[in-house]
């Protein structure tokens, strides 16, 4: 975890010893079968080095699961620069399904699966409406969230956030929705 405050919260409330992201270098290559990053990748730098480190830490059949906001989503397009999931300056990177697949490929991964996170659109839309100081922000956010949810039912790549499952190249091939 990059945030010292989040690490302290995890320790205080759950007695978890959460390490900073810089501790990745302390693990031996091939230490993990699965690594998960739930809304973390967009915060990490340097990005290329991080992908290489994650790859080295996985076993040969290891899996990398990454959940990130989708800047080509229905709600991102509706709100434009006001979209709350841009979360500048905390979000250093913004991904589309295509760009994250390219990053994975560049660093020796194939995208094995991708899944929408349909409920993120409700939260992000409500937060965006609140930040824009619109009246009835909750209601407006729920309406946009509902429209975004239906849009993602038709085309998963329109989901506000996506979960991507990567495998090292040489393992399972192709994308499964």
Predicted regions and their residues:
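Short, Lys/Arg-enriched charge-dense amphipathic segments
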Residues: 1-3, 87-92, 134-145
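Conserved SAM-binding loop
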Residues: 1-79, 92-109, 119, 161-169, ...
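N-terminal start-of-chain detector that recognizes signal peptides
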Residues: 9, 65-66, 84, 134-140
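Short hydrophobic/aromatic-enriched beta-strand-loop microsegments
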Residues: 18-20, 85-86, 114
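Short glycine/proline- and charge-enriched loop/turn segments
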Residues: 79-88, 127-134
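A C-terminal cap/extension of S-adenosyl-L-methionine-dependent methyltransferases
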Residues: 113-177
């Amino acid at each position: 975890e990059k945030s010292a405050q989040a690490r302290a919260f995890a320790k205080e409330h759950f007695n978890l010893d959460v390490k900073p992201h810089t501790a990745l270098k302390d693990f031996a290559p091939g230490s993990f079968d699965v690594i998960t990053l739930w809304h973390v990748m967009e915060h990490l730098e340097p990005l290329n080095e991080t992908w290489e480190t994650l790859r080295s830490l996985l076993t040969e059949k290891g899996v990398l699961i990454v959940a990130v906001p989708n800047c080509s989503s229905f709600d991102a397009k509706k709100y434009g620069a006001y979209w709350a999931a841009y979360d500048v300056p905390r979000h250093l990177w913004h991904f589309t399904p295509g760009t994250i697949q390219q990053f994975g490929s560049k660093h020796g991964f194939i995208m094995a699966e991708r899944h929408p996170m349909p409920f993120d659109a409700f939260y992000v839309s409500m937060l965006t409406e609140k930040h824009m100081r619109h009246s009835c922000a909750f209601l407006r956010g729920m309406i946009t969230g509902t429209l975004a949810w239906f849009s993602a039912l038709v085309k998963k790549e329109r989901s506000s956030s996506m979960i991507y499952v990567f495998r090292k190249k040489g393992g399972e091939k192709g994308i499964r929705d």
